[in-house]
Design a protein with these regions (language model features):
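Short, aromatic/His-centered strand-loop micro-motif at the edge of beta-sheets
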Residues: 134-157
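Secretory/extracellular carbohydrate-interaction modules
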Residues: 29, 65-134, 193
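Short tryptophan-centered beta-strand motifs in secreted/extracellular beta-sheet-rich domains
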Residues: 24, 89-91, 152-167
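Short, solvent-exposed beta-strand-to-loop segments that form ligand-recognition rims
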Residues: 163, 168-189
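Extracellular glycan-recognition surfaces and repeat-rich motifs
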Residues: 31-63, 73
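Extracellular carbohydrate-recognition regions
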Residues: 18-42, 201
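Ligand-recognition surfaces built from glycine- and aromatic
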Residues: 20-23, 182-208
Length: 208
């Protein structure tokens, strides 16, 4: 493992060409990490910021979404300077609270705020769901019941190549699926839903 300048990005030698991890530890609390873009699909205003958490997977910092938005609104935060067509994206996430949802997930092949893929876990529903967001309309492609515990760190990983998508949760294969809605390269990042307050750490990505 090799730490690059500012300690923000950790280069990983195995698993994928040019694989990297962002741990948010060199970003000032209250700010967004460099080269990240935050927004929301739907009405409302997301609140993304780096914040300290001593329980972080790689302490001291995490990326947190704490905005309270409408039930059919989806806050996202993407690393805008990457473009992945085939590869993987992974993250550790901790759902903290939410009356309607306690969700955390990853997005990939992100074209804009209305067009991208999502895989997420939800501590209120105890499931993992693969979605596509096309023209601002979310559609569930496949879902699997799995235990997602609130206030606990979990890992989520998606491998994608062509139309094939493979999702793993806490080190276990959750699902495999095929979809051809988005085939072009795009950005990748993290995602929540509605009133979910969720923390993220060790965001990892790589191309193949």
């Amino acid at each position: 493992m090799k730490r690059l300048a500012l300690g923000l990005v950790v280069a990983l030698a195995a698993g994928a060409a040019g694989a990297e991890t962002v741990n948010f530890d060199s970003t000032k609390a209250g700010a967004l990490p460099p080269s990240w873009l935050a927004g929301i699909t739907g009405p409302g205003r997301a609140q993304w910021a780096v914040t300290p958490d001593p329980t972080a997977a790689s302490a001291p910092n995490v990326l947190k979404q704490s905005g309270q938005v409408a039930s059919h609104s989806y806050p996202w935060c993407v690393k805008k300077d990457i473009s992945l067509q085939n590869g993987f994206v992974a993250v550790k996430f901790k759902p903290l609270s939410g009356q309607e949802d306690q969700a955390g997930g990853v997005v990939w092949r992100w074209q804009d705020g209305d067009n991208y893929y999502i895989a997420r876990g939800n501590a209120l529903e105890n499931n993992i769901i693969l979605f596509r967001m096309a023209h601002g309309q979310r559609k569930a492609l496949h879902r699997v019941p799995m235990t997602v515990t609130g206030n606990q760190w979990h890992s989520l990983r998606v491998d994608f190549s062509g139309s094939h998508i493979s999702v793993s949760f806490d080190g276990h294969k959750a699902m495999e699926w095929d979809d051809q809605t988005f085939t072009k390269a795009g950005a990748a990042g993290v995602w929540t839903k509605a009133d979910s307050v969720t923390e993220f750490d060790d965001f990892q990505y790589g191309s193949r």
